[in-house]
Structures are given as C-alpha cells and as structure tokens.
Regions:
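Bacterial N-terminal signal peptides
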Residues: 7-15
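Positively charged n-region of N-terminal signal peptides that target proteins for export
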Residues: 1-4
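Aromatic/hydrophobic pocket-lining residues that form the small-molecule binding cavity
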Residues: 192
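A conserved short beta-strand
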Residues: 235-239
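Non-catalytic accessory segments of hydrolases
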Residues: 17-189, 210
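Alpha/beta-hydrolase fold nucleophile elbow
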Residues: 206-218
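Short glycine-enriched nucleophile-adjacent loop
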Residues: 222-234
Length: 239
C-alpha cells in the first residue's frame, strides 16, 4: 500500500509538472525579446510578462516607462505579485500589507495553435481590468482559458498601481515632473494605457488583431474602462 501511494504521488507530481512545463510551440517574439509559455488546457498561457519598468525608487509616482529588453528568453510561467495593497482585505486578517510595488505585469491566454496555424490567425483581443475598489485585487483572479478555447479569442489580464500609489496628486510631485503625464497623478490609468500600448505593439505575434481590441472589467475595473474611454491617450488603442 505504501508503494502504491508513492507511485500515485509521483504520478500526480509528474502530471502537474508536464501541465506546467514550458512548451516550445508557445515561443513568441515580442519587442522585448522571446517569451515562452506553457499549455493550459486547450490554450497556451504566458504569465507575468512585464509591460513597463518597475515603478519604484525614482519612478514611483511617475507615468510608467516602457519595459527593458530581456537579457535572455523570458520564461512566462509564474504570475507576478499583486500590486501593493492592504493585506486584511484579501486574507481577513487585520493590519499589514501585501504585494509589491514591482507589479506592472500582464498575462496572456490564446488558443493552442500550432506554429503553422499561428501565421494565419488574426483573432479578437480582450483586455481584462480587475476590480477591487482600486485598492485591492490582482490580474490572476480568474482564468479565462475556457472562454479563449471556446470562442477563439485572446485574453490579456493586466495589473495596475492602486490606492495612493496609483492616484495621487501633490504640488511637490508636480514641481518635480517633466511631463504632463508625470504631473497628472493618474498613474493607475496610465498603467492601463501602457498595457494597451504593449498589446498594440506585440499581440499580433500571439495571433491577435491589433484593430480588434476590447477592454472590459469588473467593478473598479469597469470604472477604469470608463476612464480609458475618456482619455485621448487611449483613443486609438481599443475599439
């Protein structure tokens, strides 16, 4: 019986490792360099791709900057940490904080096309903005893999700075700002715009149609969709 249990555990671990293993057929070339993902059900998934430089140190309370190039092939297999937020809302425990300021990452799901099929694809793209009152939340809340495989679309989920790190205006910050975007205080909105710019530049490499991009969200994510509708900076980035 013990030997049987050992084999069962090994089988589960091997199965899990295969399902989460990197897949050479998922290699895509972005402006930053190559990324490789993995098979998730009937889809390919890429987790934790940076779409901006980390908004830390001198980039805190600044508009997002374009991401740096990869030094080598990027293994997109792990979700990034959530953006900095109160811990109690997520865990039910009082006090404390969780997440990271280095959080401007996105995740992509596409149908599991073969390399031959990929070259012929140009499918709708949907960018999901999570909810949480612009105080809590993260891009890994839901998996859209079934929607992607059933309807042949590409879904991108994004993270953005929240609370006072995402929306904060102060005279001292305006004095230090060299651009209108830096002085705006609307850093969370600008993060979502930067994600849309990344999609515009790269999603065709995943089989997406840059002229058929939909934005949608839940709760505060819906509010942020409305903000993107109102921003001239985002006017040509979705449809």
């Amino acid at each position: 019986m013990k030997r049987l249990n050992v084999f069962l555990i090994l089988g589960i671990l091997i199965s899990y490792g295969c399902s989460e293993g990197l897949d050479e057929n998922s290699v895509r070339t972005t402006a930053q360099g190559e990324v490789i993902g993995f098979k998730e059900g009937e889809t390919y998934a890429w987790r934790g791709i940076p779409f901006a430089q980390p908004p830390i140190s001198e980039l805190r309370w600044k508009a997002p900057r374009p991401p740096d190039p990869f030094e080598s092939r990027f293994e997109a297999k792990e979700f990034a940490q959530a953006c900095f937020q109160p811990q109690g809302f997520m865990t039910g425990e009082e006090g404390g904080w969780t997440g990271s300021e280095d959080c401007l990452y996105l995740n992509i799901w596409s149908p599991a096309w073969s390399p031959q099929e990929l070259g012929e694809k140009k499918v709708p793209v949907m960018m999901w903005i999570h909810g949480g009152g612009n105080v809590i939340g993260s891009a890994d809340t839901y998996s859209p893999s079934h929607m992607v495989s059933d309807h042949e679309v590409i879904v991108v989920t994004v993270q953005y700075r929240m609370s006072n790190l995402g929306w904060f205006r102060h005279p001292a910050l305006r004095q230090e700002s060299s651009t209108l975007e830096d002085a705006s205080g609307s850093f969370g909105t600008l993060d979502n715009i930067m994600a849309l710019r990344w999609i515009r530049e790269n999603i065709s490499q995943f089989g997406g149609d840059i002229n058929n991009v939909t934005i949608y969200g839940e709760s505060a994510g819906g509010h942020n969709v409305a903000a993107l509708y109102a921003s001239p900076l985002a006017s040509d980035l979705f449809h």
